[in-house]
Amino acid sequence: MPPTIPLSEIPTLTLLYTTNRLTPPETTQPNVNSIHNDKISLIRTDITKLRTAAIVNAANESLLGGGGVDGAIHRAAGHSLLEECETLNGCATGDAKITAAYDLPCDKVIHAVGPVYARAKREGMHTRLLQSCYTRSLELAVDNGCRSVAFSALSTGVYGYPSGEAAEAAIGAVKGWLDADWQRSAKIERIVFCSFLEKDERAYERFIP
């Protein structure tokens, strides 16, 4: 079995800055504080290798698997994941549902259904729907006792969401959620933005705190 990555080996933004592996953005992002940098991590790797409490899958409305990261997560989890997903009756765009992780090294899989960019943008709903995926996933994580969550780059694959816009929306949603209810957000120790492609990693680097 390929090696997995424990949470202790996923660097926070604070560590990335102090070790000069990350350069602060030229323009200060809104709502920046040290708590964000201590809680948020950025890593480029295969999300199926992360030993976080939960990982967030870029699912489709059927929840029955697909291409890209969705297919990779289903393959790594094994057929039992599909069997559980078949009982969930799908999921609406902008929402999320949670399952066991089966053969994955994490504890839970949160299946978030991001918007198809072109269609959602025509309706003026693309940002709201994508941000809803992140906040709903965090709420599910808290409700299920998951203290660390790793997000894939939702909607940036075949759904066509530009990486820069997606990263800005994702980081804005996460920071807004952290600030909205300090008592509730304290139940999450780490939020990881996990990218597989360089274009997504570079986009996160432009918009992180």
Where are these regions (language model features)?
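Eukaryotic N-terminal low-complexity, Ser/Thr- and Lys/Arg-rich leader segments
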Residues: 1-38, 209
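Short, conserved "active-site rim" segments that organize catalytic pockets and cofactor/ligand binding
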Residues: 37-93
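Structural motif
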Residues: 40, 53-55, 95, 107-111, ...
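Short amphipathic alpha-helices and their capping/turn segments at secondary-structure boundaries
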Residues: 43-47, 92-103, 137-143
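Conserved active-site and cofactor/substrate-binding residues in soluble primary-metabolism enzymes
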Residues: 50, 64, 68, 76, ...
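Conserved, mostly hydrophobic/aromatic
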Residues: 56, 73, 110, 151, ...
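Glycine/small-residue-rich phosphate/adenosyl-binding loop
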Residues: 74-119
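Phosphate/ribose-phosphate-bearing ligand recognition and processing surfaces
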Residues: 117-209
